[in-house]
From Swiss-Prot:
PANTHER family: PROTEIN PHOSPHATASE (PTHR47992). Its cofactor is Mg(2+); Mn(2+). It comes from Arabidopsis thaliana. One of its GO terms (cellular component) is membrane. GO terms for molecular function: metal ion binding; protein serine/threonine phosphatase activity. Residues 71-445 form the PPM-type phosphatase domain. Keywords: Hydrolase, Magnesium, Manganese, Membrane, Metal-binding, Protein phosphatase, Transmembrane, Transmembrane helix. Pfam families: PP2C (PF00481). InterPro entries: PP2C (IPR015655), PPM-type-like_dom_sf (IPR036457), PPM-type_phosphatase-like_dom (IPR001932). It catalyses: O-phospho-L-seryl-[protein] + H2O = L-seryl-[protein] + phosphate; O-phospho-L-threonyl-[protein] + H2O = L-threonyl-[protein] + phosphate. Binds 2 magnesium or manganese ions per subunit. This is Probable protein phosphatase 2C 51.
Length: 528
């Protein structure tokens, strides 16, 4: 083949590929320009209310009182209060599509566990628990939509050769993603997006989406509270689990903690057993920690759960919180032995609480950024503060150890612990005298990690098989949208969310399929 013919074929191939990608960019955008404009102006609240975004419809998510099914244990009880103001949420196995750095699709499994502790009414906690999933999904959708569009536009100007193994997404900047859809209406969150597409992209986008969701929940409730003259507020502690990693965003004094296995030496074990024995005597035998249930490993030491608190309480007497409150003109004083903003509000950060906003009470969450889960991390607990009126953080993990390692007869373990691990926590705290509402979510992590790894591997294999079968590269034809179906989003307890990503999955499939097609064509032409 002469060089002129080869050059002509190459130019023809490039021209064909250009039109393929032009078609994708024009016809495969996940959101209409009018809906994108609505999103730019008002975020999630505006999108769900606008007739310009007809496919976005709010679901009426309920807050379950208890569940021990599957890998998500939840429980909420009114306790000794006149009203139940606590709400909770647990949703596992959410499949979200992300672009991989090598050009292959990557579906990430996501779990959400959250507790909202309301005060001065349940309006704020109720709204937050119902809106979180919808708002989180919407923001992920728009951020991913911008990401895929930035990717396709970048691809139009860059066609790698057969030997080019650098990623097709290299060099797509944060600003390209944000400004493509003008997603900079919340400038304080822009820096959380990565400069390049790599393995951290899904985690960065999920963090960004969660922060935006929390912001928009507060915006929505602020408007509602202003219209209805509501005085209620709520804490919010939300944990995300994805790709074997964990992050937590927290407002107020609800807690998140990890219970992780730890081996103690004989000397350390001796001190632990003495402490547990004294605790049991002090509580007249009602302590959840029964030292006989801790395992001695080959006589060399003790295996037990160690608690790691993932959140910091936003109490007004915390030095940095107090400085902010006083700088805004508020003051911190104690009443009934509890520090309060202006002598009343017991938290310095909250969703709602409009009357305290001018005194330094804010709704911005404090974030524990993504950290890897390890093999000895056994349980994630997210709970309202009512449980910790009578249980220390370590006692919670001691109780979970006892229940998790009980004998087959279940001797010594209360009957309510057989319902769920969350029921075990809230009822133990109630029996020990807690006066508050109580809500808890307990996620067994070991089974969750194994499942995520298995599904991640299966997803990668499925994606490779489906793309390969859909692209007969001898003809190098672009598959129709229905030729590749990566399946609906899977979310335990929240199946209706699956429809939200259908168009996004289709766009993802077309973009990556087209890339494989053009890469094969170019390599074939240049190899001749």
């Amino acid at each position: 083949m002469t060089s002129s013919i080869k050059s002509s074929l190459l130019n023809l191939g490039l021209l064909i590929i250009f039109f393929v990608f032009f078609f994708l960019v024009i016809n495969c955008r996940g959101e209409s320009s009018t809906c994108l404009a609505v999103y730019k102006q008002g975020g999630a609240p505006a999108v769900f209310q606008s007739p310009k975004c007809p496919r976005w419809i709010l679901q009426n998510w309920g807050s379950p009182t208890h569940s021990g099914a599957g890998r998500c244990h939840t429980a909420a009880i009114q306790g000794r209060r006149n009203y139940q103001e606590d709400r909770l949420l647990c949703a596992l196995d959410l499949r979200i599509p992300f672009p991989g750095k090598t050009g292959t699709p990557k579906d990430v499994l996501v779990g959400i566990a959250a507790v909202f502790d309301g005060h001065n009414g349940a309006e704020a906690s109720d709204m937050a628990s119902k809106l979180l999933l919808d708002y989180f999904a919407l923001h992920i959708n728009f951020l991913l939509d911008a990401t895929f569009s930035a990717m396709t536009r970048k691809l139009i100007g860059r066609f790698p050769t057969k030997g080019d193994h650098s990623v097709i997404l290299h060099g797509v900047s944060r600003d390209e993603i944000m400004h493509l859809y003008n997603l900079d209406f919340q400038m304080q969150f822009r820096d959380s997006l990565p400069l390049h597409f790599d393995d951290s992209l899904p985690l960065d986008i999920m963090k960004e989406a969660l922060l935006r969701a929390i912001h928009d929940i507060d915006v929505t409730f602020t408007k509602e509270a202003s219209n209805r003259k509501l005085n209620s507020g709520s804490t919010a502690t939300i944990a995300l689990i994805a790709d074997g990693q964990l992050m937590v965003a927290s407002i107020g004094d609800s807690k998140a903690l990890l219970c992780s296995e730890k081996f103690e030496t004989l000397e350390e074990a001796r001190a632990t057993l003495v402490k547990l024995y004294r605790e049991r005597r002090r509580n007249r035998g009602s302590s959840p920690s029964r030292f006989s249930d801790f395992k001695l490993e080959h006589g060399n030491g003790l295996l037990r759960f160690i608690a790691k608190e993932l959140t910091k309480d936003h109490h007004p007497n915390r030095e940095d919180e107090k400085i902010r409150v006083e700088a805004a003109g508020g003051y911190v004083t104690e009443w009934a032995g509890v520090p309060r903003v202006n002598g009343q509000l017991t938290v310095s950060r909250a969703i709602g609480d409009l009357t305290y906003r001018s005194y330094g009470v804010i709704s911005a969450p404090e974030v524990m950024d993504w950290q890897p889960l390890v093999a000895n991390d056994s349980f994630l607990v997210v709970s309202s503060d009512g449980i910790f009126e009578k249980l220390e953080v370590q006692e919670v993990c001691d109780l979970l150890w006892e229940v998790n390692n009980q004998t087959s007869s279940g001797a010594g373990v209360p009957s309510y612990c057989s319902i769920s691990l969350a029921d075990c926590l809230v009822n133990t705290a109630f029996e020990k005298g807690s006066m508050d509402n109580m809500a808890a979510v307990v996620v067994p992590l070991k089974s969750n990690l194994v499942t995520q790894l298995q599904r991640k591997e299966q997803s990668m294999n499925d994606n490779k098989d489906k793309i390969a079968s859909a692209l007969p590269c001898s003809n190098c034809t672009l598959p129709l949208p229905n030729d590749i179906n990566l399946g609906p989003l899977q979310l335990k307890q929240a199946q209706p969310l699956g429809t939200m990503f259908n168009r996004l999955l289709r766009l993802k499939t077309e973009v990556f399929a087209a890339f494989i097609c053009q890469r094969t064509l170019l390599g074939h032409l240049k190899g001749k």
